[in-house]
């Protein structure tokens, strides 16, 4: 297993995509090997660090009011789907350490999300409508974020959701990945989990 090597510059998209898919494959491979106890301690530690670096790249390259490149979004989607499945493997195995990892990372509870315009080029008077789908996006455990609000123009859309049975989010704080006070959890925008949609004018 090789250490992940994400690019320093945000515009090195192809290299980033290659690394995301590589870690996704590692997640799937390690998940299968854990079932037969064929993962060395060194490989497992390197694997966890690669997951951490991938999540760190996600937070460091998620920009307020800007959509991700579609190819990058697709790569991250496959990574998060694989990580979600991996966490359930950890939870179901008779191993206290793996169970603890899954228990900390799989999140249920309230989350909040802002949608808005990152510049004044487009019409900022209209709030952005939520897109309900299975795409993993950034949410926060904190209901209010003045920093995010300061970066958006015009009308902002504020969402609240409650994750309950049968869903879980992936808590990035549990992996030690944090940006400011955002307390980030990744979770799709699933309509039945949404408890409130509010439009806030600047």
Where are these regions (language model features)?
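Mono-ADP-ribosyltransferase
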Residues: 1-202
């Amino acid at each position: 297993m090789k250490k992940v090597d994400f690019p320093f510059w945000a515009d090195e998209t192809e290299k980033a995509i290659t690394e995301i898919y590589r870690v996704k494959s590692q997640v799937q491979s390690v998940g299968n090997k854990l079932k037969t106890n064929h993962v060395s301690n060194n490989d497992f530690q390197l694997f966890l660090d690669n997951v951490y670096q991938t999540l760190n790249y996600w937070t460091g390259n998620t920009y307020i009011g800007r959509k991700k490149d579609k190819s990058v979004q697709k790569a991250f989607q496959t990574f998060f789907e694989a990580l979600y499945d991996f966490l359930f493997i950890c939870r179901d195995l008779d191993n206290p350490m793996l169970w603890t990892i899954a228990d900390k990372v799989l999140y249920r509870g309230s989350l909040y999300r802002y949608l808005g315009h990152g510049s004044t080029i487009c019409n900022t008077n209209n709030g952005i409508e939520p897109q309900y789908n299975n795409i993993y996006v950034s949410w926060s455990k904190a209901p209010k974020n003045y920093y995010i609000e300061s970066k958006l123009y015009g009308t902002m859309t504020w969402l609240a959701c409650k994750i309950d049975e049968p869903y879980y989010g992936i808590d990035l704080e549990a992996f030690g990945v944090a940006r400011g006070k955002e307390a980030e959890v990744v979770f799709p925008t699933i309509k039945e989990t949404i408890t409130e949609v509010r439009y806030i004018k600047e």
